[in-house]
Amino acid sequence: MGQAMVAGKPGSEGIWWNPASIAEQDNRELAIHHSQTVAGVGDALTFVLPTASYGTAALSLNILNIGEQDVTDVNGDVVGHILPRDVVFAGTYAANITHRLTAGLNYKIVQIRVDCSGECSTVGAEVRSSRAVDVGAQYDVEFGAPLTFGAAIRNMGGKVNSRATNQRDPLPTQVELGAMYRLKFIDHYVKDTELRAAGSFINSRSFGGKSVRFGTDVTYQGKVHLRAGYVGHDRRAGTSAALGLGLQSGGFAFDIARTFGGLPADTGQSPVYVSLRYLF
């Protein structure tokens, strides 16, 4: 949906867009999310545990592998390997504040790691760590209505500490506002089909500037999803289109999406996102 998910409820993936999105989740969920982007290869594992009276909790581990690099000696021979990775441990809690309003919070431990194997005397391993918080909320205009507003602030208060140089660099804070609306007119023309449209505005400040995102999701019998979206321009990349497909059978749900255009495609690697979720 063009990453316009701040007002959506996509399950465990929504933790990274808006932690409030899991507040009304009914089923426990175990999920694996995989991505291949210009930044690297990402893998996330999440477990979601809803309760009847105390809201919903989740635990997540997200690893971004930026890519192995060779260490060479003065003769150009490979003597070691550098493995830079970004690692995030996240604990999430979300709950209903009223019958219309939900809120959620992520508490994250962030590590920027550079591990090394072999001869690493000229490079050295390094771990920079920090803690940060994401907060979010979602609001239904009327209880049970098809219009939902969402807001989230990500990476609040985080500064990366370097053990080697004692530098403190702020994490890229993002502010996102958006809405999602179910278009009911399609009910008169197609049975068992729902159409939702979403849009959001993001301000990444010095990290990427401002951008907009739009998307649609067509759902058939609650089991087949066809998605399309648009990711607006910011300072890090140009505009891009997005297409996605989702399938659900019993407790298993599979989703795949791809974006086209912008910086990643121009460098020859269009981003691909794959999710496998088990609801029980």
Where are these regions (language model features)?
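Subset of outer-membrane beta-barrel
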Residues: 1-280
